[in-house]
Structure formats: C-alpha cells, structure tokens
Amino acid sequence: MTGPELVDWDLAVATGRRLVRPGPQLTRAEADEVVAELRKLAVEAEAHVVAYTHLQPQGEAPPVVVVDRKEWLRSNVAGLRSVTGPLLGKLGDRSSSGALSRSIGRRITGLQIGGALAFLAGKVLGQFEIFLPPEEVAGPGGRLSLVAPNIAEVERKIGADPRDFRLWVCLHEQTHRVQFHAVPWLRGHLESEVGAFVDATDLDPSALAARLKSAVSALRSRDG
C-alpha cells in the first residue's frame, strides 16, 4: 500500500473509548473478586473441555486475559486492522479518490468502526481473538479475552448464580481456545482462506464503504 490506510484506526479507538458505556457499579473488592474468579474458572473450564472433547492441546497455550470494555475495544480494533489490512491495501491501491476525499473518507470510516465497536464492547462476554497482530500477543496462537464488567452486569440482570454463570462463559470461550490450541493448522487454514478472498475480491472502495455503513446501521438498530 503506497498511501495512507483507508481507515483511521487511531480515530476508531479514540471514538470507541469515548462512546463506550461505563460498566456496572462495583466496589474495588467486588471487581477484584470477579477478575480473580474468572481467572480461576478459565483454568477449570479448560480441564472440562479437554476431558469432554479429548482434544489434546499442543505447544504453547494461548493466553487468557480478563479485560474491561475499553481494552476489549482497543484489541478488537488491532485485530480488525490486522485481518483487513491486505484487503484495504488492495482497495487503497486502486482508489481514484483525491487526497482530500480520501482523508475525509478514512476518518469517517474510523468514526463508524469506533461507534460500532463501542456498542459491541458493552455486549460481548468473551472472545477468542484469532487474528491479533504479533505486537498484541506473544506467538501466533491468539488470545482468550473475558470481559469482566459485561459478565458481572449480565449475571446481575438475569439473577444467575455468579459462579455458575462465570463458569458457563468460560466453558463456552475455552471450547474455541482449546480447539485452536489442539489443531495447530486451523489458524493457518483460516488465514489462507482470508488471503484467497482478498486475491479474488473485486470490491471497490465505495462499495466497501457502503457495506460498512449498512453493518453499522444494523448494529445500532439492535441496541436496546
């Protein structure tokens, strides 16, 4: 890619961090308890998944982290930037827009992405992040993130037993982590599929922007 990126990723992070809703009201002791138990239950859940599936993890295990909404948002911008980089680079090279239009467009797209991820940051309970760039996580294995404020908020809202609900979330997310940890070629396969899509795509920048706007509108229409 010879020119500026088609998305202002820094603006996406800044916008998302400004728009993301605060988490539930917790004392410091309550917050520490949630984080500590999620870390403990993540280990327990991995053992359950391995015992049930008979999948045998290989090599260094992807890390498990407990994060807040803003950190989830920031890491997802990094992952989105990594996985869409080749496609956006291809589209950027073929773009006929002038420098001013391109500068405005990349900022608008950054605002849209930040707004969409700010909404999702208050909803996601956990996520196995496959495509994080090397500077975000050591090794190529991805990372499991558990979003503590969202888990605490939902368990309160539905009146669930905290330990049971947290274990359920950990079991769900550890299933993905164990799958990728036990099948080392799976991540490379997904990367090759993404690469094949990039090579085959004939989408122009304006069409991509239109699709992004539609996706953001769909996300917002689900709020509430």
Model segments located where?
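Auxiliary, metal-adjacent structural segments of Zn-dependent hydrolase domains
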Residues: 41-149
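Active-site recognition of the HExxH zinc-binding catalytic motif
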Residues: 165-181
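Short pre-active-site segment immediately N-terminal to the catalytic Zn-binding motif
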Residues: 150-169
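Short helix/loop capping segments that flank catalytic or ligand/cofactor-binding pockets
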Residues: 154-156, 178-179, 188
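Post-HExxH zinc-binding segment in Zn-dependent metallohydrolases
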Residues: 117-125, 181-224
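N-terminal low-complexity, Ser/Thr- and acidic-residue-enriched intrinsically disordered segments
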Residues: 1-58, 62-63
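Active-site catalytic microenvironments for nucleophilic, acid-base chemistry
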Residues: 48-51, 177, 181, 185
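Generic alpha-helical structural element
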Residues: 27-30, 34, 38, 102, ...
